[in-house]
Swiss-Prot record:
Interacts with LAT, GRB2, PTK2B and PRAM1. Homodimer. Interacts with FYB1, which is required for SKAP2 protein stability. Interacts with PTPNS1. Part of a complex consisting of SKAP2, FYB1 and PTPNS1. Part of a complex consisting of SKAP2, FYB1 and PIRB. May interact with actin. May interact with FYN, HCK and LYN. Interacts with FASLG. SUPFAM superfamilies: PH domain-like (SSF50729), SH3-domain (SSF50044). It comes from Mus musculus (Mouse). InterPro entries: PH-like_dom_sf, PH_domain, SH3-like_dom_sf, SH3_domain, SKAP_fam. PANTHER family: SRC KINASE-ASSOCIATED PHOSPHOPROTEIN 2, SRC-ASSOCIATED ADAPTOR PROTEIN. One of its GO terms (cellular component) is cytoplasm. Belongs to the SKAP family. Keywords: B-cell activation, Cytoplasm, Phosphoprotein, SH3 domain. This is Src kinase-associated phosphoprotein 2. The lineage of its organism: Eukaryota, Metazoa, Chordata, Craniata, Vertebrata. May be involved in B-cell and macrophage adhesion processes. In B-cells, may act by coupling the B-cell receptor (BCR) to integrin activation. May play a role in src signaling pathway.
Amino acid sequence: MPNPSCTSSPGPLPEEIRNLLADVETFVADTLKGENLSKKAKEKRESLIKKIKDVKSVYLQEFQDKGDAEDGDEYDDPFAGPADTISLASERYDKDDDGPSDGNQFPPIAAQDLPFVIKAGYLEKRRKDHSFLGFEWQKRWCALSKTVFYYYGSDKDKQQKGEFAIDGYDVRMNNTLRKDGKKDCCFEICAPDKRIYQFTAASPKDAEEWVQQLKFILQDLGSDVIPEDDEERGELYDDVDHPAAVSSPQRSQPIDDEIYEELPEEEEDTASVKMDEQGKGSRDSVHHTSGDKSTDYANFYQGLWDCTGALSDELSFKRGDVIYILSKEYNRYGWWVGEMKGAIGLVPKAYLMEMYDI
């Protein structure tokens, strides 16, 4: 190996070697960072990191020149300054150039301790300053917790590499970020006068799921009601949300009035009880008006967060549990009637999200 103390580059470094070096360092310094390694594996990891730094010290000038050529105006570098030492470059790499761009500060939190995680998974995040080592994308474990987007080196990290509040942002697919086979897996989160966050998912479907989840929360932040509620889908659930309208036609039929008017006084109470039973039966029938469960995808929901029922008629469920909605007759109170694993009870609609995008 060339002498690490050498300050000049012995020759141009092939692009294939640059890419290989970038991938190896990402894996060794970042991916393995959150893994539970044996003592021998940790020593080997540290040795590889040192060797990579030695190689970079030899080709430092070339990396710097390459970075200047690739640096564009699309991103601002908050860590601008002299990069004449490996320690400074390493520090920038370790921090993932992920300082908050809008001045917001969030306390450190372990990935496993995030509350109310709506969606999480591994994504490739585009570096804000991707000149260092000449590569752009880094694998990150990302999580949408309430209205804050966190990203970590892995799902075992004790502290996030960065985060930002999504309020005020917009999200969209963008197939112009890459030219390889993953171009249809890219999306970006952007806002005027704010930093652009760009990601690559494992598949186009996964990218679309991230976009839909983010849009759901952003739409909720911009309104006083939960998106996809009754105003948007009222025609589908009119017969469910207004049970009185279901039973009222039975009471208004002339033949019913004639029958009960002719009953003797002592039998009116019995007739009234029968009417109440009929009304109750009509309301109960609402639970089964949605159709065949095997194809009724619109009424399948999943838990956004853990929920423990306070009363015996309330269902308890965990985040991700599948719940089939039988009725929305208590929608005005924020409750629906759901079924999970054979149990039926009330569920708070704010704790649910649609399972299928129809």
